[in-house]
Amino acid sequence: MKLFDSLANTFKKVEQGMSRATEMPLFEIQTLQGSKIEWSKFDGKYLLFVNVASACGFTPQYKGLQKLYETYQEQLEIIGLPCNQFGAQEPGNAEEIASFCELNFGVSFTLTEKISVKGVNQYPLYKWLTDVNENGIKSSSVKWNFQKYLVGPDRKLIDYYYSTTDPLSKKITRHFE
């Protein structure tokens, strides 16, 4: 009987933990072109948020991100968020960033205005992505450019991946296959 009670309590805790996940609020954010992101365009899709930079050792990941987007765009939207907080590796303005991404990598996924992903000016989206008290799943800290956060079609955080994780890694693509 004690074993049964112990198992029942374990399942109850797991169930409670699963129900803590909160849906991502629809934060207001502008694209590089200055228009507000319309979240309804992405209903039913996975969202991959990536803090990006043009002068980083991980910048070639734009190519993999574009390939990921082209392969899975029916079920995935990639949102690149330029950030200049790591080594000042994204100093450009909106026009320069857009031009760099298009000319060098053919980027056609969504790019936003430049934001802060940590610190006192942390953008609210990144507060939600990185704080278990906000997302109900886990806490993390953004370590460098090209850290990735995957949100499910239900708008709940699935996981995050450090910069060293290739965009085409099975860790990420297994969710869409």
Regions found by a protein language model. Name each.
Residues 95-144:
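Short, internal strand/loop/helix patches
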Residues 45-46, 55, 59-84, 101-105:
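Conserved helix-turn-beta segment immediately C-terminal to the redox Cys motif
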Residues 31, 51-55:
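Amphipathic alpha-helical repeat scaffolds
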Residues 51, 75-94, 108-119:
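Thiol-based oxidoreductase modules, predominantly thioredoxin-like and allied folds used
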Residues 127, 132-177:
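Thiol-/selenol-based redox modules, centered on thioredoxin-like
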